Amino acid sequence: MESKTVLVTGSSRGIGRACALAFAGAGYHVFINCRTSTDKLETLEQEILSAGGACTKLPGDVSNPETVSSIFREITASRGGLDILVNNAGIAHFGLLSDMTDEEWRTVLDTNLSSAFYCCREAIPHMVSKKQGRIINISSIWGTSGASCEAAYSASKAGLDGLTRALAKELAPSNIQVNAIACGVIDTEMNGRLDREERAALEDEIPAGRFGTAEEAAGLVLMLAEAPSYLTGQVIGMDGGFL
C-alpha cells in the first residue's frame, strides 16, 4: 500500500521541521519546503532519508502563487497529489504599527496568510476528486487575543483562523477536514529575540510554567492528520493554559 503524502511549508526549522520528522516517522512521504534556509532543508531531507523515511525537498517562496503552482506540479508528477497539507510557513515582525512600512505589512500577511490560500487552492482539487484530505493550519494565540507590537502577525493569524473555519464548512461535504492549531509560546528561533529576563517574565505568565516545544506542536499536528473525520473547523489552543 502506497504511503500517504504530506506537504509541510516552512519546514527547515522549528515547528515545521518537527512536523516533517513526525510525519516521516509515521510512514508518510513528506514534501518539505522553505524559502531561504535551503542548507537546513537539505540536512532535514538527509536526516529523514537516512532513517529510512520518504522525503522530497521542494524549496521556494510559498507567498508567490507562481512558485506554489510549480511546487504542486512537482507533487502531482511524482505522487499524484496530497493527502495532507500543513500550512506552517510564517514570519514575525515586532514593532509599533505606526513604524511599519507597506512592504513589511505585506510581507507578513503574504507569508502567513496568502501562502495558505495559495497552497489550499492548489491542494483542494485533488482532495475533492478523492473525497478525502486534511488541511492543518499553524496559527497562534495572538490571532485570538492580539499581541502588542505584533499587529501584523496577530492580524495574519486571525485571518488564518477565519480561513480555517470558513474552508472547513466549504469542504466538509467533500470529506475534507480543515483545522488549525493556535500555538502559544513555543521554544523556537522565532522567539529567539527574547532575552533571559523577558523569557522568565513570559514563563511566569504561562500556567504550565514553561514554553512549549516544537515536538509537542508536531505531535498535535500528526494527531489532527489522523483524527476522526467529524473533527473539522476547529482552532485548537496549545498554549500551556495561557488563554
Question: Residue ranges of each PLM-predicted region?
Answer:
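Conserved glycine-rich cofactor-binding loop
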Residues: 12-13
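Substrate-binding pocket helix/loop in short-chain dehydrogenase/reductase
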Residues: 96-97, 104-109, 198, 202
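Alpha-helical segment proximal to the catalytic Tyr-Lys
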Residues: 125, 169-173
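Short, small/polar-rich loop/turn modules that mediate ligand/substrate recognition or access, typified
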Residues: 172, 177, 231-233
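A conserved structural motif in NAD(P)-dependent oxidoreductases
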Residues: 206-217
